[in-house]
């Protein structure tokens, strides 16, 4: 009996040590609390996707508002976006000129949100090379058959955050902009940390920073570059109060409340922790894309070994969470998925398939 008791105590001590180490790594790198979440979502729901037939070149990042589908289309020679009518499948036109003119740009970011001003549909576009923001009047552009830019806002970024560029941008209201600031490589082994920022729209002033991580991680032996350790896909809650971040290399989502500043991480039970980035461990790919409405978060999930640079993985699992981090449903689609966009007008999740 003494021998059995001794083995039992050793096993318990080993488990406690592992748990302490995991909490140490979490607290060392993550700026909030982390809750373990169990998979109580029940059976996987099989979903049959309905085809949307479009007549014309439809490539790139998608965005959808009601009957309008937008593509940030790299195959367009002179414009960045083309728009289709979902009801008819017909192409409405091409918009947002490429070039060096006053209302043109060398590159544009994808659409993150739509809003209306005096019942006219508009969106915010970021031109990084020109350091400008464009307010694109979509309603008038479609009516006139040409790009209508209501407002151009100078928005210098190169000297703002040590050379780190903005990525996702979201208008919280008429005067406040929420922005994701991407990591910036400092050397082959180290990069800056991504964070979120609250800024004024018209005067380009930083009001508050929201840090997700406490410190960078150095690991020359890791199979991925330093700025990819904490890689993620993000989606803002439509009411502008929160953002969800799904991690590319951990089975974890992080929810930041812009009103309270509270940051919570939700990690799948049994999932890897931050120690996976140390040494020569096998780093997997987990979450790929994310979309959200005011009630739920839709995260495209892989959960397997990383794919090669020329491989096209068959990703067809969507995890549905609520805004409290609870996994409420797992969906499995009958086609593989590349990009997603949630239209909150018709309450439809649109997806594109990988281009082979």
Spans of features found by a protein language model:
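A short helix->beta-strand "capping" segment at the edge of beta-propeller domains
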Residues: 30-57, 324-326
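Beta-strand-rich domains and repeat architectures in extracellular enzymes and scaffolds
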Residues: 47-81, 298-301
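Structural signature of eukaryotic scaffold interfaces centered on beta-propeller domains
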Residues: 58-65, 110-120, 165-174, 226-240, ...
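Beta-propeller blade signature
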Residues: 83-85, 139-140, 191-203, 313-326
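Blade-loop segments of beta-propeller domains
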Residues: 90-124, 153-160, 222-225, 334-337
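Conserved blade-ending motifs and adjacent loop-strand segments that build the rim/top face
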Residues: 96, 101-105, 270-279, 323-344
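Asp-box/WD-like beta-propeller blade repeats and closely related beta-sheet repeat scaffolds
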Residues: 129-175, 179-184
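Loop/turn-rich, solvent-exposed surfaces of beta-rich toroidal or solenoidal domains
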Residues: 280-319
